[in-house]
Amino acid sequence: MKTPKMNVESFNLDHTKVKAPYVRIADRKKGVNGDLIIKYDVRFKQPNQDHMDMPSLHSLEHLVAEIIRNHANYVVDWSPMGCQTGFYLTVLNHDNYTEILEVLEKTMQDVLKATEVPASNEKQCGWAANHTLEGAKNLARAFLDKRAEWSEVGV
């Protein structure tokens, strides 16, 4: 039986056919003034087999959201997937997949050097007690260890 086409791109992705970790273009939108928005699926864990624990995911979200902007001024957003298997990276007017991989690599290397999770306090975060720097570093390290595989989505 064929699955009906959904409005959300990732709901149309056959999650049983991907091989994490990977980085893929999930969507492209052209604005009325010609701006290009590209959303990347940055998958850390194999769907339906593994997931990131919340404190590690939450800390990696904070770290990458802050650090990635040191490497790229076209980043719009870095947000976690509800399934806890990856993140979405949204960029504006930048259409170079190879450079995105390089920026992600540099960012993850910087995560490994971090001494604290940015904005992990009650004034700047909605769940400040839910952080682990070591957990975030472990996720970044595992992702970097598979750097050669990031462009192999498997679909």
From Swiss-Prot:
Bilayer-spanning residue ranges: none
Key word Phosphoprotein present: no
HAMAP family: LuxS (MF_00091)
Family: Belongs to the LuxS family.
Cofactor-binding details, from the entry: Binds 1 Fe cation per subunit.
Main enzyme class: lyase
Superkingdom, natural source: Bacteria
Signal peptide: none
One Pfam entry name: LuxS
Subunit-level organization: Homodimer.
This protein's name: S-ribosylhomocysteine lyase
Keywords associated with the record: Autoinducer synthesis, Iron, Lyase, Metal-binding, Quorum sensing
